C-alpha cells in the first residue's frame, strides 16, 4: 500500500526536519472509527496529519485533483477519495460512511480550500 510505504519512509525525515508539536496526542484515534476535522493552511496539511496520526487517515479531496490517471493512482494509493464540492455529493458521502463502518479514520478539511488568513471560512457543500 502506497500510504504505508510513504508513511514509513518519510516519517523519520519529517520528524527530523519539521519537528511537529502535537497537542492532546492522547485524543488521537488509536482504535475504533473517528473523524478528523481540520483547518487547511497549506498543501502539506494532509501529509503532516498523516505523519503524526497513529493510524491511516482516509482523506476526502476535491474532485479536480483526480483529473489525470497518474494523480488518481497516487491519491487513491494515499487513501484519498474524490468529492464534488459544488453540491451535495452522495457518492463521496457513502464513501466516508464506508470508511467509518470499517472502523477507520476519515479526514476532512470542511472549508474545501486553504485558508490564507488562518481564519475559519465557510464550508463547502460536498
Predicted regions, residues:
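Helix-enriched interaction subdomains in cytosolic or periplasmic regions
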Residues: 1-6
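Soluble catalytic domains of membrane acyltransferases
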Residues: 7, 16-126
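Short, basic/aromatic beta-hairpin or loop at an interaction surface
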Residues: 10
Amino acid at each position: 500500500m502506497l500510504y504505508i510505504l510513504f508513511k514509513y519512509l518519510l516519517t523519520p525525515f519529517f520528524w527530523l526536519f519539521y519537528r511537529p508539536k502535537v497537542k492532546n496526542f492522547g485524543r488521537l484515534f488509536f482504535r475504533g472509527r473517528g473523524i478528523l476535522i481540520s483547518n487547511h493552511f497549506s498543501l502539506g496539511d494532509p501529509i503532516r496529519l498523516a505523519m503524526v496520526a497513529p493510524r491511516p487517515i482516509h482523506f476526502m479531496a476535491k474532485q479536480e485533483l483526480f483529473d489525470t490517471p497518474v494523480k488518481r493512482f497516487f491519491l487513491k494509493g494515499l487513501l484519498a477519495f474524490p468529492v464534488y464540492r459544488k453540491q451535495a455529493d452522495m457518492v463521496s458521502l457513502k464513501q466516508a460512511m464506508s470508511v467509518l463502518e470499517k472502523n477507520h479514520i476519515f479526514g476532512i478539511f470542511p472549508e474545501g480550500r486553504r485558508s490564507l488568513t488562518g481564519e475559519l471560512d465557510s464550508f463547502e457543500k460536498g
